[in-house]
Amino acid sequence: MRYLTSPSHDIRTNLAIETYLMEHADLSEPILYFYINSPCIIVGRYQNVLAEINQAYVDQQKIILTRRTSGGGAVFDDLGNVSFSFITKDDGDGFGNFKRFTAPVLKALHAMGATGAEMSGRNDLLIDGKKFSGNAMHVENGRLFSHGTLMYDVDQSQIAKALTVPADKMASKGIKSVRSRVTNLRPYLAPEYQHLTIEAFRDTLAREILGVADLASAKTYPLDDAAQAGVAALNQKYFKNWDWIYGQSPAFELKHRRHFTAGTVEFRLNIAAGRIADLTVYGDFFGSQPVQPVLDHLKGVKYTCAAVTTALADLDLSQYFGQIEREALIDLIVEQGDAQK
């Protein structure tokens, strides 16, 4: 087995490296790939982004958002998490066999003192009944990867804030994540492993899995200039691409209602491929003009605060909504007001 760690903390680059290895690497031997991410959310291949995240909070906290090529649910990562990926040929007994690919990880954790770590359900690793690792797979052209998270010292307060969306505001056909009780591994490890840097935790895991006393003796899989160029191209094509991240979301409906001093306004929006496909407005507000021009300006627009703001820039919204402020109306459309401070 060969070994690779990413020097980047950007989830988009790290997923692009994984995709490049999946598509182009010499897999005569499996590759064990580790990466550590700055705060980010990774949604599953078939999920509705806006059904999984608190967009306003994510924007305010500058949390990176992307979509991976594998299925499964949304996860939050930060610099207290280590992600691992086994990239190998598909021998016909790999896809869906999470036990096979998590067994080396569990063995390593047991050796580090987390003897209660175990697999549970389809693709989770638990300790003391709490989840510390979610796993997913992707198979294509006779190759597959199985990747997962390992929460060593993640800021758990961020998870609920970043992944929470008010349930009564959305009716979606996407695959919603199942929220689980989560925990960090650190307090369950032997004392000598409870105060490691995240890099030292990663390297200790790697040595245990690879069966070497020193990673300098492990076989590596370096990325040459051509590989780096390929990674950059994949990053732009997929993981930094708005259409890949948001445009893959299934159609869904939103209902946003708020009472202002000048009246109540309710927007109902149909979102498809990350854009406003249709919308209507209801309320007891007073405007001097019919609201249809507002609706026309918004149809086909990306469902983001910036895009909605730009689309309405040349309209005097007071003609349509009376004394309700422009910023408040835009906040209502995209629900920016729901951000948790």
Mark where each language-model region is.
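FAD-binding core of FAD-dependent oxidoreductases
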Residues: 68-83, 125-127, 131, 136-145
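Short, glycine/charge-rich beta-strand/loop segments that flank catalytic centers
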Residues: 36-39, 118-129
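Short beta-strand elements
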Residues: 136-137, 150, 258, 265-283
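A generic structural motif
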Residues: 88-94, 187-194, 282-285
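Contiguous, small/hydrophobic- and glycine-enriched helical/loop subdomains that border
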Residues: 81-122
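Long, positively charged amphipathic alpha-helical accessory segments at protein N-termini or as interdomain linkers
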Residues: 105, 112-114, 133, 141-246, ...
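Structured beta-strand/loop patches that form or line metal/cofactor-binding pockets in enzymes
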Residues: 228-272
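N-terminal lobe of the biotin/lipoate ligase/transferase fold
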Residues: 1-96
